[in-house]
Amino acid sequence: MFAELAPYLSNPRQTLAQILNFALVLSTAFMGWKALSVYTNSSSPIVVVLSGSMEPAFQRGDLLFLWNNSPRAEVGEIVVYNVQGKDIPIVHRVIKAFGTGDGGKKSQRRLEKEADKRSGPGLSSPISHQMLTKGDNNIADDTELYAQGQDYLDRKLDIVGSVRGYIPAVGYVTIMLAENPWMKTVLLGIMGVMVMLQRE
């Protein structure tokens, strides 16, 4: 292997060109991801299902495509949300939704009470639309999964996006990389060597 690398190591200019080529590939992928994020208005426009809580609708390893430009999430809609303080996306279905003017005065009081908890004294309320979620394969709703003191999800603060499409099983690669960190290093190493060995 070192014998194959020797010609490139002896030619710094060509080696630098190959390194820049590899950096270009990575930066192009990054810019593509950012562009997709802006278009979908989602910080994570593509996510992978990590558990079986949404079976049979989605299986572990399915790749989901999200859209986050709708002001509301209706009952029955499948959304992806992040729990405050955690960075693990959860894919579950909306089973209750509360919005301004919906559900009567009782629901509105619940919204205002939750807004006070979330925004704190002296801050304007960011609450616009709230919902309760549940996994199709779960017995109970997601109240126990939410942050301490949180009864509902807020559309603007917690929701990453609504599911608009999916590809089965493709995300298993991501799960394998997450569960085996050493595989990331090996994969990046292989990609780097392949780029370095490309002849112009």
From Swiss-Prot:
Reactions mediated catalytically: Cleavage of hydrophobic, N-terminal signal or leader sequences from secreted and periplasmic proteins
Membrane-topology descriptor: Single-pass type II membrane protein
Region (C-terminal short (CTS) helix): 186-197
Sites carrying sugar chains: 41
Keyword hit for Iron-sulfur: no
Enzyme category, top tier: hydrolase
EC number: 3.4.21.89
Domain of life: Eukaryota
Lumenal topological intervals: 34-200
TM regions (residue ranges): 16-33
Active site (UniProt): 53 (charge relay system), 92 (charge relay system), 142 (charge relay system)
Assigned keywords, A-Z: Endoplasmic reticulum, Glycoprotein, Hydrolase, Membrane, Protease, Signal-anchor, Transmembrane, Transmembrane helix
Gene Ontology cellular-component annotations: signal peptidase complex
InterPro entries: LexA/Signal_pep-like_sf (IPR036286), Pept_S26A_signal_pept_1_Ser-AS (IPR019756), Peptidase_S26 (IPR019533), Peptidase_S26B (IPR001733)
GO MF annotation list: serine-type endopeptidase activity
Cellular compartment(s): Endoplasmic reticulum membrane
Biological process according to GO: protein targeting to ER; signal peptide processing
SUPFAM superfamilies hit by this protein: LexA/Signal peptidase
Location of region: Disordered: 101-131
Cytoplasmic-facing ranges: 1-15
Amino acid composition bias (Basic and acidic residues), ranges on this chain: 103-119
Entry function: Catalytic component of the signal peptidase complex (SPC) which catalyzes the cleavage of N-terminal signal sequences from nascent proteins as they are translocated into the lumen of the endoplasmic reticulum. Specifically cleaves N-terminal signal peptides that contain a hydrophobic alpha-helix (h-region) shorter than 18-20 amino acids.
Assembly and oligomerization: Component of the signal peptidase complex (SPC) composed of a catalytic subunit SEC11 and three accessory subunits SPC1, SPC2 and SPC3. The complex induces a local thinning of the ER membrane which is used to measure the length of the signal peptide (SP) h-region of protein substrates. This ensures the selectivity of the complex towards h-regions shorter than 18-20 amino acids. SPC associates with the translocon complex.
Notes on the domains: The C-terminal short (CTS) helix is essential for catalytic activity. It may be accommodated as a transmembrane helix in the thinned membrane environment of the complex, similarly to the signal peptide in the complex substrates.
Similarity remark: Belongs to the peptidase S26B family.
Name of the featured protein: Signal peptidase complex catalytic subunit SEC11
Taxonomy of the source species: Eukaryota, Fungi, Dikarya, Ascomycota, Pezizomycotina
Gene: SEC11
